[in-house]
C-alpha cells in the first residue's frame, strides 16, 4: 500500500495538518486519522445488505453492485418470480443472494425479513429502502386505494423498515448504513407533471424522514442518507405509462433525461460504503440535470 494513503507524519506536514492537540475556536483538533485506500473503502466484503424492491429495475442494479463489491444481499420484495430468477442468476456467478417475500406495508413482514437476514448471514450492515409504487392520475381521479397503497409502500414501509433495521444495528453495536430512495418528484411538483400527487407526498415524506432521523441515528453510528433519482428506464415506468389523455399533459413539458437505473445504483452504492462516513441526512440528486431543464 502506498505511503500516500496512510496520512503519515510527512504527509500531514505536507498538507499543513500536523496539528494534533491544537485548539481551534474552542474545539480540540486531534489531527488526521489514518486513511484507507479507495479500493478498501469501496470493498463490501463481509457486509450484509437488505434491498427492498430488489428484484427488478433500480433495485436489481443495486443488488448487482453490492454483489460485485463482495456483499451478501437479501432481496425483500413481493415479486416472487422475478426475485427467485435474480437469486438463481447471482448464484451462478458465485454471489450470496437470498430472497424473502416481503410486503413492506406490513410490520410483521418487515420484521420477518430482518430476522431472516440475521438467520442467514448473522447481521445487517446496510439497508436500502427502494420499494415503491407509482401511477399517473389527475387529482380528481385519485382514489383512496391508490393513495393508501402508494403511501404505505413508499413512506410507511421506509419508516418501519428503517426502525427494524436500526434496532438490529444498535444491538450489533457496529453502526451501519441506511440509504433511502426518494425522487426528484419529492422536491418539485413540476418534475412529476402534477400527475403524481400521492407519489410526490410519499417521496417528500421520505426526504423529510431521512433528514429527521439523521439526528437521532448519528450518535448510534448509523448513517442515513437519501438519493433522489430522476426518470429511469425500468419495468415500473413502462407499465405505468400515461394514458393518451395524460400524455397530452406530459408532452407539453420539456423533454428531460431518462437514465439507465445503474447510474443511480452507483450513487446508492457510494452511500452504502465508507465514502458516506461523514454524511448524515444528505439528499443526493441523481437526475441527469432534469431539474435544471424544467425550472422556469
Per-region residue spans from a language model:
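Short C-terminal tail/terminal secondary-structure segment
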Residues: 3-40, 188, 269, 280-296
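Substrate-binding pocket helix/loop in short-chain dehydrogenase/reductase
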Residues: 138-139, 143-151, 238, 249
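A short, exposed helix-loop element centered on a Lys and neighboring polar residues
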Residues: 162-163, 211
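Alpha-helical segment proximal to the catalytic Tyr-Lys
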Residues: 167, 171, 215-216, 277
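Catalytic loop of short-chain dehydrogenase/reductase
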Residues: 179-205, 210-211, 215-219, 231
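Short, small/polar-rich loop/turn modules that mediate ligand/substrate recognition or access, typified
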Residues: 218-223, 279-281
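A conserved structural motif in NAD(P)-dependent oxidoreductases
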Residues: 253-264
Amino acid at each position: 500500500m502506498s505511503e500516500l494513503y496512510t496520512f503519515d507524519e510527512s504527509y500531514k506536514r505536507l498538507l499543513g495538518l500536523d496539528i494534533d492537540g491544537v485548539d481551534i475556536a474552542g474545539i480540540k483538533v486531534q489531527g488526521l486519522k489514518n486513511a484507507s485506500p479507495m479500493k478498501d473503502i469501496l470493498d463490501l466484503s463481509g457486509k450484509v445488505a437488505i434491498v427492498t424492491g430488489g428484484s427488478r429495475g433500480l433495485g436489481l442494479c443495486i443488488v448487482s453492485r453490492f454483489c460485485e463489491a463482495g456483499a451478501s444481499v437479501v432481496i425483500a420484495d413481493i415479486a416472487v418470480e422475478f426475485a427467485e430468477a435474480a437469486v438463481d442468476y447471482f448464484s451462478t456467478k458465485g454471489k450470496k443472494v437470498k430472497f424473502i417475500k416481503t410486503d413492506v406495508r406490513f410490520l410483521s413482514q418487515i420484521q420477518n425479513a430482518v430476522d431472516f437476514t440475521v438467520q442467514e448471514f448473522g447481521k445487517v450492515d446496510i439497508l436500502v429502502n427502494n420499494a415503491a409504487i407509482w401511477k399517473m392520475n389527475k387529482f380528481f381521479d385519485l382514489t383512496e386505494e391508490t393513495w393508501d397503497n402508494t403511501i404505505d409502500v413508499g413512506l410507511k414501509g421506509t419508516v418501519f423498515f428503517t426502525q427494524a433495521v436500526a434496532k438490529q444495528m444498535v444491538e450489533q453495536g457496529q453502526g451501519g448504513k441506511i440509504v433511502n430512495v426518494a425522487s426528484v418528484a419529492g422536491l418539485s411538483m413540476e418534475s412529476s407533471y402534477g400527475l403524481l400527487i400521492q407519489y410526490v407526498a410519499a417521496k417528500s415524506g421520505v426526504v423529510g424522514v431521512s433528514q429527521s432521523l439523521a439526528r437521532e441515528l448519528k450518535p448510534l453510528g448509523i448513517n442515513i442518507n437519501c438519493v433522489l433519482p430522476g426518470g429511469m428506464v425500468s419495468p415500473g415506468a413502462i407499465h405505468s405509462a400515461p394514458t393518451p389523455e395524460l400524455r397530452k399533459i406530459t408532452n407539453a413539458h420539456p423533454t428531460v433525461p431518462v437514465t439507465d437505473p445503474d447510474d443511480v445504483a452507483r450513487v446508492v452504492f457510494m452511500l452504502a460504503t465508507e465514502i458516506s462516513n461523514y454524511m448524515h441526512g444528505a439528499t443526493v440528486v441523481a437526475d441527469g440535470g432534469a431539474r435544471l431543464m424544467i425550472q422556469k
